[in-house]
Amino acid sequence: MSLDCTSHIALGAASPAPEETYDHLSEVPVTREQLNHYRNVAQNARSELAATLVKFECAQSELQDLRSKMLSKEVSCQELKAEMESYKENNARKSSLLTSLRDRVQELEEESAALSTSKIRTEITAHAAIKENQELKKKVVELNEKLQKCSKENEENKKQVSKNCRKHEEFLTQLRDCLDPDERNDKASDEDLILKLRDLRKENEFVKGQIVILEETINVHEMEAKASRETIMRLASEVNREQKKAASCTEEKEKLNQDLLSAVEAKEALEREVKIFQERLLAGQQVWDASKQEVSLLKKSSSELEKSLKASQDAVTTSQSQYFSFREKIAALLRGRLSMTGSTEDTILEKIREMDSREESRDRMVSQLEAQISELVEQLGKESGFHQKALQRAQKAENMLETLQGQLTHLEAELVSGGVLRDNLNFEKQKYLKFLDQLSQKMKLDQMAAELGFDMRLDVVLARTEQLVRLESNAVIENKTIAHNLQRKLKTQKERLESKELHMSLLRQKIAQLEEEKQARTALVVERDNAHLTIRNLQKKVERLQKELNTCRDLHTELKAKLADTNELKIKTLEQTKAIEDLNKSRDQLEKMKEKAEKKLMSVKSELDTTEHEAKENKERARNMIEVVTSEMKTLKKSLEEAEKREKQLADFREVVSQMLGLNVTSLALPDYEIIKCLERLVHSHQHHFVTCACLKDVTTGQERHPQGHLQLLH
């Protein structure tokens, strides 16, 4: 009784005022039943006290026996106290073990975090190695292309050497034929012949310079075409890689969603178990000795629920930030390319509808321009065929790397030999120029007079003038035809250049789109990492809750053991009451002790009143704690429901945007970056529509002007 009184007094000191607690009595029916039970117990105790007053009159004779028995009971109580102290020591040891185990758990968590960081570092190094391998493969492909170019240049140089040799031989034969005089003319003078020869030489040099310039322009255009093909190859490979990355990202996102669903289900199951355990704790409050421990457990659970509340609030804030960031991205896209004020959902939907209407009008305009674009599409089809062939060659080139390395040395030797041949050709060109100078010197009349004589000089001059006039007319006609052909080639190459420039502008737009897609994918990777971190935190929380459940179960078993001990004590009290009934037979001896017994009974009544008051205060305190826990659970549920509502709003917004863009929502799970990509395409098409129309108009006007130029040249 003394231990119970002290515990009740301690609980009463920490309990709140009765004015605050009586308001909640109507809400908790269990406490009313307990109060009725305690009142019935008090009434029974009072009736028993009245009976004992009558019995004490007959129990004075057996007081000495009772005192002896009380001494024995005091000895047993001291033994029980010693056992209680031993139990307290064991509890202290177990608490120290629990603290050490918690420290070990924290160390293990730190080790797991270190392992996760090491795994992330290894993954980063693996990605870097993969990127290096890809760059090396690109370098190998470029070296193969350079080898092919070198081999082609060597073959072209050989062909040019053979052609130059043939031309040189033909020129020598033509000069020999020209030097043979066939016809005569008496009108031309020596000075006229010299002037005509000089004019012919100047015209030949001018035409040669034009031919060299045209050949250089042709080579430059060919190199640009090759570079554009190489860029197309690289862009196609990058597109394939990025498509694979996008597929992997979608798969990982689905896995993360599944993990989140499983974590939410586990959390709900844990909440159910926590509720069941709270009900068990409420049932275990009938034991007075375990009330302090239950209150401490409730405080711990409330602190942990506050932590979970904070975590759920953080999750809600993250979901809100994701929703606002997604909406702000769309608003920023529409702001950057269109004049837009505000970033609400209604304004965004209105802008998207306006863009759809504009696109419909643009489609009508495009249907009119498709006839003009068909010619350009044919050229693009040819380039796509070249592109496919180049892809096949690239696949074959990876297998032929080892063989090409052996051929590299051979081709380098051939390059050296080609350089030697170029030097020889330059030397032969110099000889050829010297030979022409010598011919011009030999065409003088003094040398011809010295060789053939003075009499044959006029005949030789007339014959040469006639031959030179014929050759001059033939050369002029040939030069005109060559110049006309070169001008045609220049015009065709200019048209090709314009088409290639348009193609290059389209490719640059594609590159910009790909860069934006990369940025979106990096954002997705960051979101995936954040989701991984949240999942890990949830797993840690689940583990902690499971540990706490285990501890609560252990405490429940301990409480059951204590209940068994209390039952044993009740049995002992029943035995004592039987002994008291036996002692009541000796009432006559205890008449002298009535007054003392009455005083003791009054003190017992006061103690009972105090115990009842303390029990009420403890019950009210427990009710307050339960109400706090229930309010926290309600706030948690409300926050979760708000998060679910916001997720539904996000999903509805995505569905509306995707339906307006014409995407299939029901077939497959659409990622956010595809919707953003479609919006960016709409904005790009809105910006570049007028530019493309202007370019097409320029092309059509150029095509209308070119045939007029051809007619002028023919005239």
UniProtKB/Swiss-Prot annotation:
GO biological process: microtubule cytoskeleton organization
Keywords attached to this entry: Coiled coil, Golgi apparatus
Keyword Coiled coil included in the entry's annotation: yes
Chief site of localization: Golgi
Keyword Coiled coil found: yes
UniProt-annotated location(s): Golgi apparatus
GO molecular function, one term: microtubule binding
Residue ranges that the Swiss-Prot or TrEMBL entry lists as coiled coil: 30-286, 360-418, 478-656
Residue ranges of the region described as Required for binding to microtubules and Golgi apparatus location: 355-591
GO cellular component, one term: ciliary basal body
Subunit description: Binds Golgi-associated microtubules.
PANTHER family tied to this protein: COILED-COIL DOMAIN-CONTAINING PROTEIN 170 (PTHR18863:SF4), TSEC-2-RELATED (PTHR18863)
Role: Plays a role in Golgi-associated microtubules organization and stabilization.
Protein name: Coiled-coil domain-containing protein 170
Source species: Homo sapiens
